[in-house]
Amino acid sequence: YEHPHAFYRGQIYQKIWDYDGSSVSNKQYFSQSGQDKIIHEVFFKDYTHGFFLELGAYDGITGSNCLFFEKSKNWDGIAIEASETQFVKLEKNRSCTTLKAVIGERVEEVEFVEVIQGLTQMSGINYENYSRSLAIFDDNEKNQIEKRTVITKTVDSILREGMVVDFMSIDIEGNE
């Protein structure tokens, strides 16, 4: 269920963040709409040396919900990205552990669609709800995609036994 005014509320929050984000004090934050600032101020204001798990880390900088914690609060973590193109950038941009993987509920073979040109943040697993994204790619010749079969990994298989995750960010463009 989505509230009928959610779209407009999101646009208003984005405009506020765009304006607020122009201030010098907000330059340290990296998320798309100030999520990292809110998470920091509400939950982790004085918390240093935490541990994050970032699913959908993209290039490690653009829209990152965890980079602030890594750079400013001495956190460590694991940044995971499925796109081969973006993973190369992620490895260069982050000092935390990076992992190229497609995360799933269970280990299985899936088709991964990588957008290598155009809407590159829209790469994802090709399943029934992804058909709308594929239609968008087909409608715009600027988008170039590559499909490949991959084996998913589970979050449990990535984390060591007893590992405590303080903050988990899942940013996979509506495919959560």
Residue ranges and their predicted role:
Residues 1-176:
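Phosphate/nucleotide-binding beta-alpha loop and adjacent structural elements of enzyme active sites
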